[in-house]
């Protein structure tokens, strides 16, 4: 088996570190690997905890550049094949044979891991899923961009992107208000610095929208998503889909319901997405176009994949139930509430109707 280096950069991560590193240890115990840990200036017990899992610990002076720290970690690795993980990502599922298969079949490809992002929405824990580039051969790739760094080929050409059987729980959006505020301030300083250099990059507007969304600053979230969508972006690109969905939800949160109806103009480009169809249901629902809302929620349930858990199942059925209940059609509402499983708001709806 070809050994790999798991490269980690960290600063003051004692809160997450035991859970994170033990998740790697448990899932990688039968596969040859090293854990390479780069500390960028911790003042807590981060390095002490890391030393319980690896002897490969290095210091890197923080220079406000995530790619510089990442690339330093690549340079210190013992092996060419690199797996990148962050300390707030806990490995929950991994088949190490997937590494071997990709290395043999796609030696110049990039491995995509599955990330389950946990966050709070309307007071409830929610999850959205994405795939991120994390496994590659350092002979062919490095990192670029000072923030939200990206894997870039060292030479010209387009790399194959391959899903590998590794899933992590990402809890970076689940901190305290103070922790999230500090993280956003750090990130936005770097993003705005990059925006001065490349003012026509829609990806930077997307990331600024993401930052403000994390701290529930709806006005700025809406502004930056909207700026990003002024550019012509391929709907198949994941961040474009996330930006459209985020912009739509921010318009609804700001009660700009009529304005949100312009999403009808991009329906054909994004209707392959359950998340978009669900959003259209919400837009119609908030504009009192209830028949159209029901149709879009039903359309969402016919899509096999979604980013946010429940969008193509119980959340869509629940909203249909709400529409029928408000329309004075309790039997129809009850039918939809009952297929929502143990979703608490649906159970409450069943109890209301039963009274």
Task: Kindly give the residue locations of the regions a language model identified.
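Short, well-formed alpha-helical segments that are part of the catalytic scaffolds
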Residues: 8, 12-27
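Short beta-strand/loop segment that forms part of the nucleotide-sugar
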Residues: 8, 32-41, 58
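Acidic helix N-cap motif at the loop->helix transition within catalytic regions
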Residues: 16-18, 44-52, 94
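A conserved acidic beta->alpha catalytic loop
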Residues: 23, 38-49, 62, 86-90
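Conserved donor nucleotide-binding strand/loop of the catalytic core
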Residues: 33, 48-68, 72, 76
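Catalytic-site signature of metal-activated, phosphate-bearing donor transferases
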Residues: 71-74, 91-220
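Short aromatic/hydrophobic "clamp" motif used to bind/position activated sugar donors
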Residues: 82
